[in-house]
Design a protein with these regions (language model features):
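Active-site glycine-rich loop that binds ribose-phosphate moieties when present
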Residues: 16-43, 88-92
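Single conserved hydrophobic/aromatic residue that forms the stacking wall/gate
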Residues: 1-12
Length: 200
């Protein structure tokens, strides 16, 4: 939104989450970039200042390649500030990658329409997890798979409440002789200011 006020051409990765942003600017100010090939072939209007934004819940690896191409082709393109990056998504994708190859089953807690939760499942599979599945809560655990798993990984989408995580751990502990080891080196301690309208 800040970028659009400055009359820069915006390049945004397509997804349901960006529909609101798309509605904030005129069509000639926005170019959707969905693939690396799009980034290689996009031809913005001459003389426009360029900026890019990404859906913050997308794969860090996927967007990095697209951004790299845009920055190579357009050295003066402006990217988002550090505080605009979804730190929870980045941290969780890294943690899932770190343990995926060591687990027989990765459970990711999140809603079925949560793109960042779905992406964690994909990251787990790509990083070597024998199997990975998205579950809404403890009631969705596929026990036929869990019973065959010697090591189970557990992660959660950025908006999944901690109570759901603890419920799943307890459900596993009720069924198995469980040893819990926490992975991940970054604590999510970033606090965001409320919009002024909510603090009045």
């Amino acid at each position: 939104h800040t970028i659009s006020r400055r009359q820069r051409q915006m390049c945004i990765r397509d997804s349901p989450e960006v529909e609101g942003t798309m509605g904030q600017v005129s069509a000639d100010q926005v170019t959707l970039i969905e693939t690396v090939e799009d980034a290689r072939t996009v031809e913005p209007p001459a003389g426009r200042h360029l900026a890019f934004a990404t859906q913050t819940t997308l794969s860090v690896d996927d967007t990095a390649e697209i951004i790299s191409v845009l920055q190579f082709r357009f050295p003066d393109i402006t990217g988002p500030r550090g505080e605009d990056i979804c730190y929870a998504t980045t941290n969780r994708q890294k943690a899932v990658k770190d343990i995926a190859a060591d687990v027989d089953l990765m459970l990711v807690i999140g809603a079925s329409n949560s793109s960042n939760s779905q992406r964690l499942v994909e990251v787990a599979k790509q990083a070597g997890a024998a199997d990975a599945m998205l579950i809404a809560d403890k009631h969705a655990i596929a026990w036929e798979l869990a019973d065959q798993a010697g090591h189970i990984g557990l992660s959660a989408g950025a908006s999944a409440p901690e109570s759901l995580v603890q419920d799943v751990i307890q459900a596993l502990a009720d069924r198995y002789n469980l040893t819990v080891t926490e992975h991940g080196h970054i604590r999510e301690t970033v606090n965001f200011k409320l919009p002024p309208i909510l603090t009045q």
